[in-house]
């Protein structure tokens, strides 16, 4: 078998095209109008419309409403859990991201744990999280549990 050498490499057939020379006589196939058709803005030198121009009709970018606000470059994401999701946990149990994953309450984490106050705290729980809403903290402590904020 012949070895492969750099000087023997050739481009794939059909991948390279010779530059089309237009306006060089009708026998060349692109003479006279050079493939631009008869008259009109698109046949003129420098002719053509700007991107988004729709012939005088109100263009799409003006028909749509302006978008308010902006998107954060580095948005914060948290793992959210509500009190109603913790109702089946046994009393006086430690609650953190790992125990919630083991219990099947969470299936994945997307950042620090935030406890929200939707629902009721039925049993005393020792919850460790990065953030508690005021209503969640109030309900947990009213049920005899503790809220520990992790750094």
Curated annotation (Swiss-Prot):
Gene3D superfamilies named in the record: 3.100.10.10
A Pfam family annotated for this UniProt entry: Ribosomal_L27A
GO biological process entries: translation
Keyword vocabulary terms for this entry: Ribonucleoprotein, Ribosomal protein, RNA-binding, rRNA-binding
Region called Disordered, residue ranges: 1-51
GO cellular component, as recorded: cytosolic large ribosomal subunit
Family: Belongs to the universal ribosomal protein uL15 family.
Name recorded for this polypeptide: Large ribosomal subunit protein uL15
Lineage: Bacteria, Bacillati, Cyanobacteriota, Cyanophyceae, Gloeobacterales
